[in-house]
Amino acid sequence: MDHVPALVLAGCCFLALLPGWACGLGSMSSIAVSYGEDGPVFCGLNSDGSHLVACFGADASVLYGAPPNIPFLGLTAGDGFVCGLLLDTRQPYCWGSNSYVKSGVPQPMVEGARYSELSAGDNHLCALRAAQDGGRGSSAATSLIDCWGYNMTATHAVDEAVSTVSAGSVFNCGLFARNRTVFCWGDETVSGVVGLAPRDLHFQSIGAGGYHVCGVLENAQVFCWGRSLEMQQVVPSSAIGDGDVNIVPMDAMSTVVGGRFHACGIRSLDHQVACWGFTLHNSTSPPKGLKMYALVAGDYFTCGVPAETSLMPRCWGNSGPLALPMAVPPGICVPTACSHGYYEYVNHGEVGSIKVCKPANSRLCLPCSTGCPEGLYESSPCNATADRVCQFDCLKCVTDECLSFCLSQKRTKSRKLMAFQMRIFVAEIVFAVVLVLSVSVTTCLYVRHKLRHCQCSNRELRLAKSTAYSFRKDNMKIQPDMEDLKIRRAQEFSYEELEQATGGFSEDSQVGKGSFSCVFKGILRDGTVVAVKRAIKASDVKKSSKEFHNELDLLSRLNHAHLLNLLGYCEDGSERLLVYEFMAHGSLYQHLHGKDPNLKKRLNWARRVTIAVQAARGIEYLHGYACPPVIHRDIKSSNILIDEDHNARVADFGLSILGPADSGTPLSELPAGTLGYLDPEYYRLHYLTTKSDVYSFGVVLLEILSGRKAIDMQFEEGNIVEWAVPLIKAGDIFAILDPVLSPPSDLEALKKIASVACKCVRMRGKDRPSMDKVTTALEHALALLMGSPCIEQPILPTEVVLGSSRMHKVSQMSSNHSCSENELADGEDQGIGYRAPSWITFPSVTSSQRRKSSASEADIVGRRATDGRNVGSSIGDGLRSLEEEIAPASPQENLYLQHNF
């Protein structure tokens, strides 16, 4: 452990008890920004008080590395990485691509150590230990600070109590708790921050930048020191604007943050932003007239949380994200009451007051504003629940704004008076109406009483009875038919709500684009991350509306673990939008054929086959369990999405249609689909059956095995079917395997999958297997790939079974077709198994052994090659023998009815 004198050490960021919420290059707050060559990323805690983190930006390592279910107290960030202080253990946890700050809990880590603050520089992280017993934490006389990263990995001891720390690029500075003086340590070769630190000034807070430090003094003035003029050594002078970071504004500030060569602060008077220092010529200016709650600085850009109910951050500068479709809290929740000079923040939204801190004993404290601008007076002082309120002094108006406000106040008073008079007038009218009605009712009752004594003729009585009967009959007709009312699962959103969630459908939030629609990432007001599919406005509005309602109707009916879940929709004029669950890992196409080669390598054989099994289960549900069956018509790798747990979901039902109750009966439909995946029989003869989806899925299986696109003209044989099928039939399985991955030690599983793919892409639809048999064969192959015989393979530990208490016993029935002796032996070994219905489970690798056998499609069960060709190799024999291993996958009909009705 290093023992550092009081003037040579570091620290972090100021918490809720310090003035304002600000975050320099890497100080801790509820928001943080990473930067670097892979692009900027904005991360923030959710505004719902869950303490979960959400990120938005360009760096994939930070976006996909963010833990979705781990709560954090606060965040900090540096060059290509983000760190957070874990809410439960109070230890740091990092993610990203920085080579000096590794992902996970930094090591070495003192056992049992707990920390109160974090601070990140360009390539290092420092943490201030919390005061605790046992000698592992800070005390009233000594503070311990642990650092990790480039030239920083060490534990430092300070002879006094340290209240806050803040990290720059290659140095750190902190404040002593006793006298609020500053001390610094680290590499000052470029900045000179350590030697220039003012030892006789007292600060409320500090914010370290790249090569300088700025702080808010006790009189709310800003003081900066350092050598940011040396930036010309890093950035070409032709790209730099004018300004010196040491020339600070004279306004009183509540918070200050530091970027690479600039600084920004929030003015105490009006909570607006002021920035100074060097900027790049193409930088955007800070927002004018917009109040801010909190700030965070990257290298050449700054972001802030505006004082609006939406709490959607804004950024300015260079290279940073401009619009962020996410809501974040303006600070960190603390378990103590707000001290003097602070008030508890509550978000007053459209639906009422929303407390951003969930625990009842925690709160978010913001600093009170000081004073009022010229021409205004303080009508309400700052208290524990609200900031001070300033109003115009109508007796001393000198500006047009003041005159307009005072005139509106007079009009408001006049309207209130008129409203009061109107209420009196309405009350008088109501009294008169009630009086007239009372007299009328009294008169009617009197006349009716007199008429009772009159004798009516028989004709009049019959007429009265006939009228009464007709009235009762008409009443019966107008009763609503309650059976016609339908309950939809999909929620209806307003266009404004979805536009706000996606940042105005900006290009930054666009995650995909097709021929007929664009997909945007958005965050709803409750913090839910969604994908919004927006239809491209077409000239044929009627056709576009038909496809929209078709997909909406289908997804509202369907419910399966491996079909994309529809959350809601919006139909506003010509705008048609569908809201889905957001799939964090994109599509299978992006992994197999995207520009990032690392995505393809991460998709190992086990994960690829698992995705194939899960997609097959989804299509099997459409064909076998939906009533009536659904034909997708656009099965392809770009329509198989992957969620954050790497589970597959079948998506895009815009071209889907309802099939006949008998899945073998063809429909006469014009061809629709994607080139390379389209069934040749459907294309030529216009015969559409569920086997058309089987052909498309066979192409996807070939993509998974080979890593090649369905149609890739850079190869001599551009069509994947024409290239792969002859090689598979010849037994040359190595020739089609993706060269990016090493082949498994046992190729039997991949041989089975290749054989299934060949059968799926047969020219005649009746020669192809059904999806239940394809699913069974793929599950056999997955069991082999995982290292156990498919008959004895248990359910994988990672398999998630929903409603497992509803598992059913299914007896194995022998096939009506002739089988070999080995097949008979296999049938005896299987015995009785258990399987949850497919519409409530994720796929099981052993479910194929537990399905009821079927003899409806003899081409797969027990079928032998009849063309007389003999490959002569053991590989060819192994591929042909797979035909005997594919069995039907559908459960019994009574099980389906039992679980659905």
Curated annotation (Swiss-Prot):
Disulfide bond annotation, renumbered to this chain: C338-C365, C368-C382, C372-C390
Ranges for domain Protein kinase: 505-712
Binding site for ATP: V511, G512, K513, G514, S515, F516, S517, C518, V519, K533
Topology Cytoplasmic: residue spans: 445-901
Residues annotated as catalytic: D634 (proton acceptor)
Any one of the GO BP annotations: embryo development ending in seed dormancy
GO cellular component terms attached to this protein's record: cell surface; endocytic vesicle; multivesicular body membrane; plasma membrane
Transmembrane spans: 424-444
UniProt KW keywords: ATP-binding, Cell membrane, Developmental protein, Disulfide bond, Endosome, Glycoprotein, Kinase, Membrane, Nucleotide-binding, Receptor, Repeat, Serine/threonine-protein kinase, Signal, Transferase, Transmembrane, Transmembrane helix
InterPro entries: Kinase-like_dom_sf, Prot_kinase_dom, Protein_kinase_ATP_BS, RCC1/BLIP-II, Ser-Thr/Tyr_kinase_cat_dom, Ser/Thr_kinase_AS, TNFR/NGFR_Cys_rich_reg
Extracellular topology ranges: 25-423
EC assignment: 2.7.11.1
Molecular function GO terms recorded: ATP binding; protein homodimerization activity; protein serine kinase activity; protein serine/threonine kinase activity
Residue stretches of each TNFR-Cys repeat: 357-391
SUPFAM superfamilies on file: Protein kinase-like (PK-like) (SSF56112), RCC1/BLIP-II (SSF50985)
Keyword Signal set for record: yes
Glycosylation site residues: N151, N179, N282, N383
Topology in the lipid bilayer: Single-pass type I membrane protein
Function in brief: Putative receptor protein kinase. Could play a role in a differentiation signal. The CRINKLY4 (CR4) mutation affects leaf epidermis differentiation such that cell size and morphology are altered, and surface functions are compromised, allowing graft-like fusions between organs.
Name listed for the protein in its UniProt record: Putative receptor protein kinase CRINKLY4
